[in-house]
A protein has these predicted regions:
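Structural motif corresponding to alpha-helix initiation and N-cap regions
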Residues: 7-10, 26-27, 73
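Helix-loop element at the rim of GNAT/NAT acetyltransferase active sites that forms part
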Residues: 16-27, 133
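Conserved donor-binding loop and adjoining core beta-sheet/short helix segment
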Residues: 21, 28-86
Length: 142
């Protein structure tokens, strides 16, 4: 079941996201901007008490992380119908699942966290340069 993140989920979220750079990017954004931010919303996919995926909506961008690649495509389809993202970023296998929903987007790959711009076009910086590198990032760009 997909639901919005609350402060009570903090330890579960930290434990789930701390292993890979994709998860750490989401965790750092949550820690930097909090859950009360008007430009950021975090959704959790919790099944039988176990966290299966995390979806961060930040300034018309979506970052996702699902360890076992169990991306909830129905949830993303609903989300995209409400808010068409500028970018969708995450681990390559996670983003590849989303690509069939966004057929007019261009796929890009890299070893670095993609740039995310705020509502006024300013670059959002929530990680150090060293933290931005690692993993095989995939980004769908409009």
């Amino acid at each position: 079941m997909i639901r919005e993140y609350t402060e009570q989920d903090k330890e579960m979220l930290k434990d789930y996201l701390d292993e890979e750079p994709y998860g750490r990017a989401i965790l750092t954004a949550v820690e930097e901007y909090g859950t009360d931010s008007p430009f950021q919303t975090v959704y959790l996919d919790v099944r039988d008490g176990k966290l299966e995926g995390v979806y961060l909506c930040i300034c018309r961008n979506i970052m996702l992380y699902c360890k076992e690649n169990k991306v909830d495509i129905d949830f993303l389809e609903q989300m995209i119908s409400v808010m068409v993202p500028d970018k969708v970023a995450g681990r390559k296998d996670n983003v590849n699942i989303v690509s069939w929903l966004l057929t007019d987007y261009q796929a890009e790959y890299g070893k670095r966290l993609p740039e995310v711009c705020g509502e006024n076009g300013e670059l959002l910086e929530w990680m150090t340069e060293e933290e931005k590198y690692g993993g095989e990032w995939s980004v769908l760009v409009k």
